[in-house]
Amino acid sequence: MAGATLSLHWTGETGPPPVRTPDTAQDAVTLLDSGSQAFAQLGSEPLEWRLDPAALGFGPADNDGVLSQEPFAAVLSCSDARVPIELTLGQAANELFVVRVAGNVTGAVCRGSLHYAAAHLPSVKLFAVVGHSRCGATTAAVDATLHPDKYLAIATDGPLREIVDSLLAGVNFAQRALLHAHGAAAVDSPHFRARLVTLATLANTALSALVLERDLGRPCAFGVYKLSERSVGVRRADGFHPGFAMAPKDEDEITSLVLAAAGSLEL
């Protein structure tokens, strides 16, 4: 990114902002994918970014002078400070209804917020779960699995334990997938812990999407934000692919996804 420039210009009154009201869940996925791709390219070459006032929450308002809330997608993401979700998905104010929690876990309070979006925001066409690489919450769950003595400090902190416990199923699932793909000797690899964090993040993100789609009865997508590439995507049998995927429909589909991803990770 060295040497690249980014110029920001306020456009003022230049007409109405572009219409971003997708008709379907797939249209919403396309908008998120294009926004993610644009963010990934940010800084790679000189870029001029023109901001319409509506992009920051200023624009046509109701009679009371306040914008109506009309997001096209509701997103559950991690609270990691390195992943500002509207920016990473290339979206502006009033385009995403965002719920953030460490580990992007589907606890009752988070699901309640998403239930609100489903019931009261008809503009929402898609629900999405976004995890990210090197997630601290997932790493804590991995360490608790590989080194049970480290769980003792977590066990005495009820709220933190609730988050970590929510991630353990995905960690165990990912660990079994790695052993299936690479054999029992995989645990001796110096890269095993890092690969387990990577795969557990995918497993938990996909599992959360499956759970939410069943819970809400609405289309749900998922993806993992890769910090090194500044892009949301999904790991497949041949590596990381930019772009969201729709939630697995059943346990067989998520098992196939995680097993394929496990085989793509070198140990």
Model regions and ranges:
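Non-catalytic terminal/interface segments that mediate subunit docking, oligomerization
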Residues: 30, 40, 76-77, 87
